[in-house]
A protein has these predicted regions:
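Pre-Walker A-like glycine/lysine-rich segment at the N-terminus of P-loop NTPase domains
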Residues: 1-47
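The start of beta-strands in P-loop NTPase/AAA+ ATPase cores
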Residues: 3, 124, 254-255
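Short, solvent-exposed loop/turn segments at secondary-structure junctions
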Residues: 10-12, 25, 32, 132-135, ...
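Phosphate-binding P-loop
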Residues: 15-21, 247-252, 279
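Phosphate-coordinating catalytic segments in nucleotide- and nucleic-acid-processing enzymes
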Residues: 47-242, 246, 251
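Walker B catalytic motif
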Residues: 258-261
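Conserved hydrophobic alpha-helix in the ABC-type ATPase nucleotide-binding domain
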Residues: 273-274
Length: 280
């Protein structure tokens, strides 16, 4: 597990250290550096999996950082350094700027030993953007194999993930809802339904993908009623679903990063979302 972060020369951070707990909440005034910290995490995640000597500032995880000049700290012109301390040791990335107009950073130094979150293990690192997809009639199917399926940065693959994994037992008994633990693991979709029902209202969910199709579909229903498309559901449910699903399939010991988990939820639902994230 990651316990500390240290950032040098990146955006507003000349040199800052941060403590990381099993549940870490970033709060503060606008422009105080919350997003910059998250962006440094995503840069490290991308740098850990690329075989290139450079990392793009625009594209990975939906990043739109602009040019190298935009990410350099204005107080220091030293190389950007991003480090994470974990129970397995410290991993450090040093990134240099080829030119101020460059749309990438060069990876001058990368760690040999990586925290699990950056190890490339499927579902060990998940980032969910604040701009998650609202209700859609259909959404794209993921191009990844079953063992590597993820919900996507905007939750765009939730329907596909549920169509493949929904009727399977959750992989860890630790992910069984507290009401049912320590009973044997249940189907993933039942766990998703349990948490969504607490956050929003009693609800059932299914993901469907026709054989050979490149799209998948979510359907919902209140217990005992007819199935409806996600376009007939509120934003709160479709905004909360990627968080619940990603959390339940996340690799133990990894890192789940969620921006604005409370978005489009009633205050009572926001409270229950906090309970879910703390329980993970």
């Amino acid at each position: 597990m990651i316990t500390k972060a240290e950032i040098r020369g990146f955006k507003r951070f000349a040199h800052e250290r941060f403590a990381i707990a099993p549940l870490t909440v970033l709060a503060g005034l606008n422009g105080s550096g919350k997003t910059s910290l998250l962006q440094s995490v995503m840069i490290a995640a991308e740098a850990s999996k690329t075989r290139s000597v450079a990392i793009s500032l625009n594209g990975p995880f939906g990043l739109e950082l602009g040019t190298a000049e935009d990410v350099l700290n204005w107080e220091t012109r030293s190389p950007i350094e991003i480090a994470f301390e974990a129970t397995t040791g410290t991993a450090t990335w040093q990134l240099t700027v080829p030119s101020e107009e460059a749309l990438y950073l060069e990876i001058a130094e990368r760690p040999v030993d990586l925290p699990k979150a950056f190890s490339g293990t499927p579902r060990a690192f998940t980032y969910l953007s604040a701009e998650r997809l609202g209700p859609r009639g259909f959404s794209a199917a993921s191009p990844l194999p079953e063992a590597e399926l993820e919900v996507g940065v905007k939750g765009e693959f939730c329907a596909h993930v549920l169509s493949v994994l929904g009727d399977r037992l959750i992989e860890s008994v630790d992910r069984s809802h507290p009401l049912y633990a320590p009973a044997p693991p249940r189907l993933l979709k039942y766990e998703v339904e349990q948490w969504l029902s607490e956050i929003a209202r009693p609800i059932e969910i299914t993901g469907e993908r026709a054989s050979g199709a490149t799209v998948a579909e979510l359907r919902f229903r209140a217990p005992g009623s007819a199935w409806v498309r996600s376009t007939n559901m509120g934003f709160g449910i479709t905004y909360a679903l990627p968080i619940i699903l990603a959390g339940l399939i996340a690799e133990k010991g990894g890192l789940l990063v969620v921006e604005n988990p409370e978005a489009h939820l009633h205050p009572a639902g926001q409270s229950r979302m906090g309970v879910f994230l703390a329980w993970l």
